[in-house]
Amino acid sequence: LKHERIDYRTGILSSPAEVPAAEWNALVARDARPTPFLRHEFLDALHVARCAVDATGWSPRFVTLTDERTGRLAAAAPVYLKTHSYGEYVFDWAWADAYQRNGVPYYPKLLCAVPFTPVQGTRVLAADDDARRRLAATLLALAEQSDVSSLHVLFPTETEAQLFDSMGMMLRQGVQFHWINDGYRHFDDFLGTLEQKKRKNIRAERRKVHDAGVTFRRLTGDAIRDADWRFFSRCYRQTYRDHYSSPYLNLEFFRTIGQTMPDNLLLVIAEAGGKPIASALAVYQRDAGGGGTLYGRYWGAVEHVPCLHFETAYYQLLEFCIEAGLDTFEGGAQGEHKLARGFLPTVTHSAHWLAHPAFSDAVSRFLERETNHIHAYVDELQDHNPFKRDAD
């Protein structure tokens, strides 16, 4: 049988609100393992709270394909016109510097990504493989026809990375640290799989926090009150202040996702002396067939207690994963310290196209060297695997 070619109408939208939420989320639901960050509610909250908008250097250019026959959304991607490289977690500052030194503008650039979110997941939502290929090709054509230096697709799935590779884009790899729930019944069950020294260190860290009189509340869904959001937002801002930088997100954003996607949120609040002193926010997704993934996202403290960061942002979340039957905990960007706590290295992907031929060649050679370095780095990390080999 000859397959009829479907005609699609391309849309370039300046706000997520221009896409019907139900149609967008229907594409998300088709994913084998959808992430909450691609949900319409999350992307719209970034826009409504003015975190990812023109004024912050994130001009939405959401790209959609609509089936001309049915009028239904067939594919969509979160795309932004960027005037800087903040909030991306795939670092191209050196590329931008090289452009500037040679008098060539690097910005604006096109970015297909979830703002401020280094989480691997589908970037081209689609009803089927044909629509996915067509939208991927549309992204590249848009970059080629626009006055931009480049197109970058951050943290796509491995399958998508291969698709972009087949279109001539350059692939880049990175490393994150993920924890796998090997059917643990409780936290001690997990500790029992670690080498003795690692196990001892974790117990010592937890004891320090306990002995300091710190207790914890784990809140999900509607149990998170506005006072909790206000305190968490204060902690979040403090983390950025401690690093002499400006926060990307704000209280309005956190309140908004608290209202629109409460079933995906876990807020941990640490308390001492009857008052809150630290907090961590995680996002999680239950899989239809059981299990699911928890994403550690933000943490902050207004008082210092030794090892409080590890307890609040790791051990409390690990316990939640075990109790809730979630099978993966993605710890986010960077952090070799996670290795000693049971998180193993995982390779992430990005895809890049540069319009300037000479720069494209130079970056291609750089990425070859960098990929070799990444592979050697992962091998080295695996040599320091914290789990028992055969016996303690």
Label each PLM-derived region with a short phrase.
Residues 1-392:
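N-acyltransferase acceptor-side catalytic subdomain
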